Curated annotation (Swiss-Prot):
Name listed for the protein in its UniProt record: Protein sds23
Subcellular location per the Swiss-Prot or TrEMBL entry: Cytoplasm; Nucleus
Job description of the protein: Involved in DNA replication and cell separation.
GO BP field: cellular response to glucose starvation; proteolysis; regulation of mitotic metaphase/anaphase transition
């Protein structure tokens, strides 16, 4: 995603020269100038065949680079794209070791832990989450406690923002706690994490001892668990670290040569490995942002693909992006389009991180596992969208793939239906008048193809587990459990004064 500076061959007379152009040297000469040139010719007969400066400028020799033969053939370039070399920063501590003997305790550090107390206000917790850059905060009873009683991440923040905006209708058994939140908001009492940590769908807190092997982690993560809390063998109440799917995939990629059973999978295509899911959730770019937030909260997913009218992927919205919505001044964004919010995300990345590139969150069925994992690690994404680069409605060139043969993941030829989301009451006119960014104007609109599936970290680790002879749990069953354990049902019906009270000033 980086651009190399182009080398150019510049003429020394291209700027700052007092020489006349070829046209002015012939058409605008004065008679005296003609005489002088004739006199010079008569005194220098040996120079009559020498090229003039004008002739020299007309016939500037081409750059030697233009005649240079490519050092790599197209096939070699394609092979390099499909099978990117693993990073050279493999940890020498794991070279030559049987990966079944490597413990997860070797891969975590207490320095990575970020704790908050259960009575910490949600505003303070949100600031810590954003300022530290941690993907998750561990919740403990008090600073003296070494055990975790829960977690707080961007999915929880998303659930709270929906509640604060009055866009979540709680289940019957949660009405009392919902009213308590309203009372605290009206009285200006800080709302502690204790009251909001379980608002959204989340998996049970899973722990593993530090002595557990990497294979145990592969089997656990391959069954749909996204992160585990690593605890001491001597005291299972003492937290030593936190280990995630992403960290494990990154570790296996960087040290793949030490694990032949996994390394042999990388050159194979997603289609041949039968990896990925056809059950993909997307949202049209012209839908309100609040619809995307509700879908992620209801489905328990960390990101959602944004598509255009032809189902080409034009962008990606994740729960991490809700950090851009934590002030009341961000309220209009909820009613603006998903496409507009993507432009806000890109603008924020450029201002804060100095990045003007567009991260590519998609692959295609012919992409190799190596190409896919390298992209996952580079974008730090939990999911990549699988697109059909050869569809008639594609808006740009295909993502490089191992084969030019189109092997779709889906069998139906009709476009998949857009997620059904109740729009509820009409948005205020102020929101409707906000400028809208067309999907075709986004960088992603020129890169992708038609959305046909999704491949996640769970899919990759489930494949690794099965290739290693393990029997991981069915990820689909894990997703079903999260849905059944949902603490709220999504609705866009506003909750009157409660939403306005919670939305006064800063949301959190």
């Amino acid at each position: 995603m980086t651009d190399r500076p182009m080398e150019t061959v510049a003429d020394s007379n291209s700027s700052g020269s007092n020489l006349a152009s070829p046209r002015s040297s012939t058409d605008s000469r004065t008679p005296s100038a003609s005489v002088r040139s004739l006199r010079l010719s008569s005194h220098a007969p040996n120079h009559q065949h020498r090229q003039s400066i004008s002739d020299t400028l007309r016939a500037t020799p081409g750059s030697p680079r233009a005649r240079r033969q490519p050092s790599l053939t197209q096939a070699a370039i394609q092979s390099l794209i499909d099978n990117p070399p693993a990073p050279n920063n493999a940890n020498p501590a794991f070279v030559g070791r049987d990966w079944r003997e490597i413990s997860i305790g070797e891969l975590v550090s207490p320095d990575d832990l970020k704790f908050v107390e259960i009575n910490t206000g949600i505003e303070e917790a949100t600031n810590i989450l954003i300022d530290t850059g941690a993907p998750v905060l561990l919740i403990r009873e008090s600073p003296q406690h070494k055990s975790a009683v829960g977690t707080f991440d961007y999915a929880d923040l998303n659930a709270y923002l929906l509640l604060a905006a009055g866009l979540t209708q709680p289940n019957e058994e949660l009405l009392a706690s919902y009213e308590e939140l309203a009372r605290k908001a009206k009285e200006g009492i800080p709302i502690p994490l204790r009251d909001v940590k379980d608002l959204g769908r989340k998996e049970p807190l899973t722990t593993l001892p530090a002595s557990a092997s990497v294979m145990t982690a592969v089997q656990t993560f391959g069954g749909g668990v996204h992160r585990v809390v690593v605890v001491s063998e001597r005291d299972d109440n003492e937290v030593l670290g936190i280990f995630s799917q992403f960290r494990l995939v990154k570790f296996l990629w960087e040290n793949g040569r030490s694990f032949p059973v996994i390394d042999q999978l990388y050159p194979q295509s997603l289609h041949d490995l039968r990896i990925g899911s056809r059950d993909v959730i997307s949202i049209n770019g012209d839908r309100p942002l609040v619809d995307a937030l509700q879908i992620m909260n209801e489905e328990g997913i960390s990101s959602i693909a944004v598509v255009d009218s032809h189902f080409n992927v034009v962008g990606n919205i994740s729960t991490t992006d809700v950090k851009l919505l934590t002030r009341s001044s961000s309220l209009p964004l909820l009613r603006n389009t998903c496409t507009h919010f993507i432009s806000v995300i890109l603008s924020n990345r450029g201002l804060e991180e100095g990045k003007d590139s567009f991260p590519v969150f998609h692959v295609n069925p012919g992409s190799t596992l190596a190409h896919t994992v390298a992209k996952v690690v580079a974008t730090r994404s939990h999911r990549l969208w699988v697109t059909d680069p050869l569809s008639p409605s594609s808006s740009g060139p295909p993502t490089p793939s191992h084969s030019s043969v189109h092997i779709p993941l889906v069998t139906n030829s009709s476009p998949p239906p857009s997620p059904a989301v109740n729009n509820g009451t009409a948005a205020p006119a102020a929101y409707l008048s906000a400028p809208s960014i067309p999907a075709s104007a986004l960088p992603g609109a020129r890169l992708s193809g038609r959305l046909v599936g999704v491949v996640s970290l769970t899919d990759i680790l489930n494949l690794h587990a099965r290739a290693s002879g393990l029997s991981p749990a069915d990820p689909a069953e894990s997703r079903s459990r999260r849905r059944r354990s949902s603490s709220s049902s999504v609705g866009v019906r506003r909750s009157g004064e409660i939403g306005r009270e919670l939305f006064s000033g800063r949301i959190v």
